[in-house]
Amino acid sequence: MRFSTLIKVLQTGDAGLRWSQAGLDPWLEGAASLDQASAAQLSFLEKGNALTAALGASGVGALLLPDQQDLIDLASQRGIAFAVFADPRLAFAEALDQLYPRRRPLAEIHPSAVIDERAVVGPGTAVGPRVCIGEGSRLGADCIVHPGVVIYDDVVVGDGCELHANAVLHPGSRLGRGCVVNSNAVVGSEGFGFVPTAKGWRKMPQTGQVVLEDGVEVGCGTTIDRPSVGETRIGAGTKIDNLVQIGHGVTTGRGCAFASQVGIAGGARIGHGVILAGQVGVANRAVVGDRAIASSKSGIHGDVAPGEVVSGFPAIPNRLWLRCANTFSKLPEMAKTLRELKRDTPQ
């Protein structure tokens, strides 16, 4: 694809094309990071990007740049084709769709798939080899169900969803439109519910369901449990990384992002637009307000106010945590000073 052709497509997107350089129009065969790109590949830079220095030595053929004069001047001096965008990262994401178009499987049902006669598969839906679909389940139109997916009884999958290989949807699960469940993820598994008795642990039946609203994406190996009663609900547009555990009865707002190894205990309430970085733990029944952010390995045991940034274990406001971390590194020196003061102080 010619760079000029790509830019014509991108100018209709959401990245905000400002202007593009005239005269240079390389043929692009793909994309790569700036330090690895060749003359037939596209890359991008953001304002203040740490790779700015690498531009001088890069063999990249074309660039998507921010409106930053030093980058524009350097690209011009090196004879690199470029276009300037308000959001070059978003432009790069849109460009990847053009450079690497996805191949959609044919809308047919593989003969090895096992589909209950009372299940419904919508028009345009592709069902791969060894898929199992249980009684009363309903798949919407234009879905893609990859090999080995298991859909239990009474599951509802909205239009345009994609279920990757070996994903499992347990009974009663509900998926809205455009959801993606990646390989080996489990939606609607039994919640961790047991009642202590004199004879040991008595299992609490988990009769509830999991609801994924429109546009939710679930990463590989992630599990989302159903509760004993009621529902576990994931808000529209929420993106969940690999290996995340979401307990029974959790509710999240719209547009959240949870990184790998996040664990959310049963009954927690997560607001809209919340970001939980890697390995964050949220205790049962904790409440996290809208747009709050928890940095990696934070342990949230109480409530987090809307818009607050927290860090550490137990989680505290990020600025306070930074001060505490700075103090912690000075503890050996402080202990030495205290010993000297004690030694020099008359008894």
From Swiss-Prot:
HAMAP family: LpxD (MF_00523). The active site is at residue 248. NCBIfam families: lipid_A_lpxD (TIGR01853), PRK00892.1 (NF002060). InterPro entries: Hexapep, LpxD, Trimer_LpxA-like_sf, UDP_GlcNAc_AcTrfase_non-rep. CDD domains: LbH_LpxD. Signal peptide: none annotated. The gene is lpxD. GO terms for cellular component: carboxysome; membrane. Belongs to the transferase hexapeptide repeat family. LpxD subfamily. SUPFAM superfamilies: Trimeric LpxA-like enzymes. Pfam families: Hexapep, LpxD. It is an enzyme of class 2 (transferase). Homotrimer. It comes from the Bacteria. Pathway: Bacterial outer membrane biogenesis; LPS lipid A biosynthesis. GO terms for biological process: lipid A biosynthetic process. Catalyzes the N-acylation of UDP-3-O-acylglucosamine using 3-hydroxyacyl-ACP as the acyl donor. Is involved in the biosynthesis of lipid A, a phosphorylated glycolipid that anchors the lipopolysaccharide to the outer membrane of the cell. This is UDP-3-O-acylglucosamine N-acyltransferase. Keywords: Acyltransferase, Lipid A biosynthesis, Lipid biosynthesis, Lipid metabolism, Repeat, Transferase. Its EC number is 2.3.1.191. The lineage of its organism: Bacteria, Bacillati, Cyanobacteriota, Cyanophyceae, Synechococcales. One of its GO terms (molecular function) is structural constituent of carboxysome shell. The keyword Acyltransferase applies. It catalyses: a UDP-3-O-[(3R)-3-hydroxyacyl]-alpha-D-glucosamine + a (3R)-hydroxyacyl-[ACP] = a UDP-2-N,3-O-bis[(3R)-3-hydroxyacyl]-alpha-D-glucosamine + holo-[ACP] + H(+).
